[in-house]
């Protein structure tokens, strides 16, 4: 992208931000045998934006569809390896080997082998893990069900002894089921079967109820809770389960129970009622668990060794595959020659890059042992080229602020040149406090001094934005310190830094009164606001007047800059119509009204006059013939005002009427063959067309042009008033920032200091710090930033900036390694 070609080093000439780079449409004809290497070298150069010459074809119909599918399959394997390494906690190692030293065919074979091996290891490991989880559940069943059968056996033995002792022939309700055969007639004996297993605890009550209903109560079920969670063999997830034992009678009941167990996801395990066999099974299960644990551990070690091997080459393979895929995607944008022996490509490149592109084509032909070299030629076109600004790490953020509004049209004047200074300055006008500015500066210096380390780390969304705009914030903090010194505010506290105050108090009550009680005893305070103003009753009216007038002066100056930029645009594109019927009347209208107001403000400051400027400006329109009286600031002011008013009124039809008729006349002359000679000069014809707003089309809609000019005129006339008023936000936010800072200092810090209590002091200091950081350094910074952004986008840029271009996006490998699929 544009950001990667900054400064004046390397292949690029010195940076120029005012106009985008001159671009040219180039055509390259490349032999098939050197096409791959040619595109690779151009990707390393990163100065060609290829056009898709096969847009009518689907991706599957293109020449290199098979190669892209092959790269996609290798990329899938790479993603699989990355996922496996992430699960195992293995970090890919940074490699210093050159990716060009490896062959794609070798990589493909190696990836195939490694994937097959890893898949086999995972499958074996999953099978062993499933067996291990089943044995863990089986062991729990043996323990819990064994306890139940043992207690039942003990209870049966005790009851049998009691029956024999007391000679009681009746069956008890609690007679043990297992010993029933000893206490009943063998001819009347009923054989009971049983099933054991585990059921999820949240389903256990429903499971028991369904079993009871399905068998009409002809079952006996006993459940035991397992304290710790167990891993389910089927899902591989931890779950809380109960061990159950169900006794039933008959095969029909058994089939019902089996179906219900299957529906509830209950895992069943075999169990013997013989205590000796239970002990033998427990021993066997414990032994197998120990063996499986050892086997699983060995399998995981083997898997980790394999993943470590993959991690050593992972970054190298990943970068190689991404580059190859990007190369084939670009080759698919080139059209196949009718002979099918060469590829033809077209694309945009900066004019200065022609030599570097030709060198890359020559190197590719030599390195690929091609018998035929590539052909490079410049094409003539009327198509709008992309916009390319070479920026560095300092100017990139300012360019992004402008691009967020709209990318500059080809070779249109770039607002970023002045935004580098005006944006932080307007921010500082609203944020003027040199204490807060120092805090911002320290935070930004941390980001700047550690930028190499931080640029390689993944930061959060907010931190990423702050880091990306670190040089913008740096400039904002410097200007805030400057305006803070002018306002003489350090966390709202004034300091006589440059000299003592020019005033002294007439008496003791002077500080409680207005400035009438002050006597000027020394020279005027040399820089900024005299500290004596702070704390007096007239502080707010004085600062209000100062900042409001200052906001108007700044606003009118910046709007004039915008209109002057439109003059340089018109001059660059050789559009005399825009100079005489847009720039000139706009300058006259704005300065005859608000430029005149700015001059009155300066005269009032210099003379100390008590004239009411509101009255002067209002009655300049309402009663222009009335005498000014005490509001007169200079001789012949009435005549000057009448002249300015007349010029302002004349400038409105001057903007509206001539331009559509002149454009119509130019169109008619062009179609009579009077202007065809200019088409030989590609650059000029391109420039005229880009500035003409589409007036050179076959059909000239006069009504459409006239309505467009009418809207533009109305917008400028009304905008001159609303935009000037909009700059008063500088005054409002500056006042709000100052008052908030004063409130936090007086009502939090000083109030806490008034108590003779250390705890209250600490609380007061903490509240002051958090309020200052949270409200003034975060919220107020964001607020002032957004308002400065609005003033640039709306009030400044709409005077000259069209912003309807598109960004130069060259084919480059610079960002390939960081892209996500």
Curated annotation (Swiss-Prot):
Modified residues (N-acetylalanine): 2
Single Gene Ontology BP annotation: vacuolar sequestering
InterPro entries referenced in this protein's UniProt entry, alphabetically: V-ATPase_116kDa_su, V-type_ATPase_116kDa_su_euka
Phenotype upon gene inactivation: When associated with VHA-a3 disruption, day-length-dependent growth retardation associated with a reduced accumulation and storage of nitrate ions in vacuoles. Increased sensitivity to zinc ions due to a lower zinc ions sequestration in vacuoles. Reduced calcium content. No effect on sensitivity to sodium ions.
Vacuolar side stretches: 444-470, 571-582, 663-757
Membrane topology: Multi-pass membrane protein
GO CC annotation: Golgi apparatus; mitochondrion; plant-type vacuole; plant-type vacuole membrane; vacuolar membrane; vacuolar proton-transporting V-type ATPase, V0 domain; vacuole
Residue intervals annotated with topology Cytoplasmic: 2-422, 492-549, 604-641, 779-821
Tissue: Expressed in etiolated seedlings hypocotyls.
Compartmental location: Vacuole membrane
Domain of life of the native organism: Eukaryota
Function: Essential component of the vacuolar proton pump (V-ATPase), a multimeric enzyme that catalyzes the translocation of protons across the membranes. Required for assembly and activity of the V-ATPase. Involved in vacuolar nutrient storage (e.g. accumulation and storage of nitrate) and in tolerance to some toxic ions (e.g. zinc ions sequestration in vacuoles).
Subunit structure: V-ATPase is a heteromultimeric enzyme composed of a peripheral catalytic V1 complex (components A to H) attached to an integral membrane V0 proton pore complex (components: a, c, c'', d and e).
Family: Belongs to the V-ATPase 116 kDa subunit family.
Protein name, UniProt field: V-type proton ATPase subunit a2
Gene name tied to this protein: VHA-a2
């Amino acid at each position: 992208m544009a950001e990667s070609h900054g400064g004046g080093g390397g292949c690029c000439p010195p940076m120029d931000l005012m106009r985008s780079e001159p671009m040219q449409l180039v055509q390259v004809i490349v032999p098939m045998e050197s096409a791959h290497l040619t595109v690779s070298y151009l990707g390393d150069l990163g100065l060609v934006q290829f056009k898709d010459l096969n847009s009518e074809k689907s991706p599957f119909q293109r020449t290199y569809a098979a190669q892209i599918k092959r790269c996609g399959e290798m990329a899938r394997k790479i993603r699989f390896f990355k996922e496996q390494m992430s699960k195992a906690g293995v970090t890919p190692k940074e490699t210093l080997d050159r990716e060009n030293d490896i062959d794609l065919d070798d990589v493909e074979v190696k990836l195939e082998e490694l994937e097959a091996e890893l898949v086999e290891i995972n499958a074996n490991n999953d099978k062993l893990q499933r067996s291990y989880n089943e044995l863990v559940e089986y062991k729990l069943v043996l323990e819990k069900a064994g306890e139940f059968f043992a207690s039942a056996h003990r209870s049966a033995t005790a009851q049998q002894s009691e029956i024999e002792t007391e000679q009681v022939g009746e069956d008890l309700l609690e007679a043990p089921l297992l010993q029933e055969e000893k206490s009943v007639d063998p001819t009347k004996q009923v054989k009971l079967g049983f099933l054991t297993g585990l059921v999820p605890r949240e389903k256990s009550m429903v499971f028991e109820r369904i079993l009871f209903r399905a068998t009409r109560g002809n079952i006996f079920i006993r459940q035991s809770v397992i304290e710790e969670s167990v891993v389910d063999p089927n899902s591989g997830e931890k779950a809380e389960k109960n061990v159950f034992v169900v006794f039933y009678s008959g095969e029909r009941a058994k089939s019902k129970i089996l179906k219900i167990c299957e529906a509830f996801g209950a895992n069943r395990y075999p169990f013997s009622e013989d205590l000796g066999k239970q002990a033998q099974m427990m021993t066997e299960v414990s032994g197998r668990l120990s063996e499986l644990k050892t086997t699983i551990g060995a399998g995981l070690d083997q898997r980790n060794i394999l993943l470590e091997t993959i991690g050593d080459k992972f970054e190298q393979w990943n970068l190689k595959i991404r580059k190859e895929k990007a190369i084939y995607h670009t080759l698919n944008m080139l059209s196949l020659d009718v002979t099918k022996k060469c590829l033809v490509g077209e694309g945009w490149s900066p004019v200065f890059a022609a030599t570097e592109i030709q060198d890359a084509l020559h190197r590719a032909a030599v390195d690929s042992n091609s018998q035929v070299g590539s052909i490079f030629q410049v094409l003539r076109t009327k198509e709008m080229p992309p916009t390319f600004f070479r920026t560095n790490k300092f100017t990139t953020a300012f360019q992004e602020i402008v691009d967020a509004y709209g990318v500059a049209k080809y070779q249109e004047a770039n607002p970023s040149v002045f935004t580098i200074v005006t944006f932080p300055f307007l921010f500082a006008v609203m944020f003027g406090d040199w204490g807060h500015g120092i805090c911002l500066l320290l935070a930004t210096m941390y980001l700047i001094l550690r930028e190499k380390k931080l640029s390689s780390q993944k930061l959060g969304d907010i931190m990423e934005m702050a880091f990306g705009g670190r040089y913008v914030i740096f400039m904002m903090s410097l200007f805030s310190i400057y305006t803070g010194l002018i306002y003489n505010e350090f966390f709202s506290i004034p300091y006589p830094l440059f000299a003592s105050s020019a005033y002294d108090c007439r008496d003791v009550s002077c500080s409680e009164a207005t400035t009438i009680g002050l006597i000027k005893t020394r020279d005027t305070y040399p820089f900024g606001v005299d500290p004596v103003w702070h704390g007096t009753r007239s502080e707010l009216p004085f600062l209000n007047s100062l900042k409001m007038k200052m906001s108007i002066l700044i606003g009118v100056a910046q709007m004039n800059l915008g209109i002057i930029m439109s003059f340089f645009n018109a001059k660059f594109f050789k559009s005399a119509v825009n100079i005489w019927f847009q720039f000139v009347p706009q300058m006259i209208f704005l300065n005859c009204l608000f430029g005149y107001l700015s001059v009155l403000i300066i005269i009032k400051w210099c003379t100390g006059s008590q004239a009411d400027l509101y009255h002067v400006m209002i009655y300049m329109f309402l009663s222009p013939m009335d005498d000014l009286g005490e509001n007169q600031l200079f001789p012949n002011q009435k005549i000057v005002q009448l002249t300015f008013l007349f010029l302002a009124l004349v400038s409105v039809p001057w903007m509206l009427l001539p331009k559509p008729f002149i454009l119509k006349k130019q169109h008619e002359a062009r179609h009579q063959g009077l202007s065809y000679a200019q088409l030989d000069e590609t650059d000029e014809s391109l420039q005229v067309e880009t500035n003409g707003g589409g007036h050179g089309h076959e059909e000239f809609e006069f009504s459409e042009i006239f309505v467009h000019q009418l809207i533009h005129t109305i917008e400028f006339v009304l905008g001159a008033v609303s935009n000037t008023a909009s700059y008063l936000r500088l005054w409002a936010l500056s006042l709000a920032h100052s008052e908030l800072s004063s409130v936090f200092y007086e009502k939090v810090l000083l109030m806490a200091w008034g108590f003779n209590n250390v705890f209250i002091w600490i609380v007061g200091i903490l509240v002051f710090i958090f309020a200052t950081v949270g409200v003034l350094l975060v919220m107020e910074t964001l607020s002032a930033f957004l308002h400065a952004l609005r003033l640039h986008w709306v009030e400044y840029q709409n005077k000259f900036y069209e912003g309807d271009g598109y960004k130069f996006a060259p084919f480059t490998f610079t960002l390939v390694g960081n892209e996500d699929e």
